[in-house]
Structure formats: structure tokens, C-alpha cells
């Protein structure tokens, strides 16, 4: 039975099989170069796919965690978690946003990014990779819309999130994704946003970031 055919009867489908299948599809969309759209971050292709997984397996997380946990504990070697520096303060990014609703979306996404970044840095080795995909499923639909519209502030947050993947390059399906995404985002937002907000990300991607907390910077 294909996943498409199984979805209408997903209550009857074995939850672990549905979770694994949908996760493999998300990884495929993440890794496959054929889904890349010119001039647009590839994250905008795989974010919606990844965000659909929790909805598919809603109500079955305890079963999935129990059955799949032993297999998920076998992780290939990767860079030490301590090589990922603390996330700089990004709250000033919201300055200049006049619409309270839009500002709230940025603030919430920033809060979720800080949470996801800290979870990723502290995660045990077997769950380190999985923790890197926490932020996309935590942000709101409203923030995802801002990303799709290429709003500079949203793309700045996306670039900071993408820096996580610079420490996961040993995985064949991740590779140089962090660098590729950053280059696309830099072109979209322009020199001013790049200079003020993306220098730290560039340093992380190139392995030059300090372990000290980044300095807060203002921006329009």
C-alpha cells in the first residue's frame, strides 16, 4: 500500500510504519537536488513535508517512541556537540516591525529557535541529528508564510537555524547544505542585512565562530 493510499485510513495503519515512511520521504526531499528551485532556499521545499509528519502520527507518539527507540540509538559518528557555539541574541531583529501580529510571529520563531538550538547542543549523541529538525515543526504557520514571502527577518532566522547543519556535514544527505542555503539567503536579503545579521552565521559555517556568545546587533 502506498503512503498516499494509506493516508485516508491512517488510523488503521501501523503507526511505526507510517512514521518511518513519512520520515524517509522528508529526508529524500531534504537531500534530493532535483527538488531545488533556483534562487530559493531548499528549506522552503522540505519544511512543509517535515511539518506534516506530526499530524500523520498524532496520538501514536508513545507507541513510536517505545518501538523505535532501540534502533534510533545507533548513530554514526559526527562532530562533537561542543563545536556548535551558543546562539547570539536575535531579539533586536524585531525592531522596526510595526505590525504587532507580524512582530509576534518573529518573536515566537526566535524563542523557538533558541529552544531548538539549546536542545540540539545538549542532546545525547543518538538524538543529536533528530534534534536538528525540531525548529521547523515548532514554528507557526504564520511564520512559515513569512518565509515563503522571503521576508528578510524570517530568512535571517532561517540562516541561523541552518548553521546547525554545518556540524552535520559527515552525513551524506546533509553535506554542504548549510553553506549552500546561506549563500542563497545572502543573495535574497542583500548586502545590508548580510553585513549586520549574517556575519556570525558565515563564521559558523566556515568554522571560525567563537564559543563566546555573539554580540547583539541592531538592524532595520
Positions of PLM-derived features:
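Hydrophobic/aromatic-rich effector regions of fungal transcription factors
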Residues: 1-38, 160-167
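C-terminal effector modules of eukaryotic transcription factors
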Residues: 42-220
Amino acid at each position: 500500500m502506498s503512503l498516499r493510499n494509506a493516508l485516508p485510513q491512517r488510523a488503521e495503519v501501523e503507526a511505526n510504519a507510517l512514521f518511518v515512511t513519512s520520515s524517509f520521504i522528508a529526508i529524500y526531499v531534504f537531500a534530493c537536488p532535483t527538488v531545488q528551485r533556483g534562487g530559493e532556499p531548499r528549506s522552503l521545499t522540505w519544511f512543509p513535508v517535515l511539518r506534516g509528519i506530526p499530524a500523520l502520527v498524532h496520538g501514536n507518539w508513545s507507541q513510536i517512541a517505545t518501538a523505535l527507540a532501540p534502533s534510533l540509538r545507533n548513530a554514526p559518528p559526527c562532530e562533537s556537540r561542543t563545536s556548535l557555539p551558543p546562539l547570539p541574541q536575535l531579539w533586536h531583529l524585531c525592531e522596526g516591525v510595526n505590525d504587532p501580529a507580524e512582530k509576534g510571529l518573529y518573536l515566537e520563531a526566535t524563542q523557538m529557535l533558541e529552544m531548538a538550538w539549546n536542545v540540539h547542543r545538549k542532546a545525547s549523541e543518538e538524538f543529536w541529528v533528530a534534534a536538528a529538525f525540531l525548529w521547523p515543526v515548532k514554528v507557526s504557520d504564520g511564520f512559515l508564510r513569512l518565509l515563503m514571502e522571503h521576508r528578510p527577518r524570517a530568512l535571517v532566522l532561517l540562516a541561523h537555524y541552518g548553521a546547525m547543519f554545518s556540524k552535520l556535514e559527515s552525513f551524506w544527505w546533509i553535506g554542504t547544505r548549510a553553506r549552500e542555503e546561506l549563500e542563497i539567503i545572502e543573495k535574497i536579503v542583500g548586502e545590508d542585512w548580510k553585513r549586520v545579521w549574517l556575519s556570525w552565521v558565515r563564521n559558523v559555517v566556515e568554522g571560525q565562530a567563537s564559543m563566546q556568545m555573539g554580540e547583539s546587533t541592531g538592524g532595520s
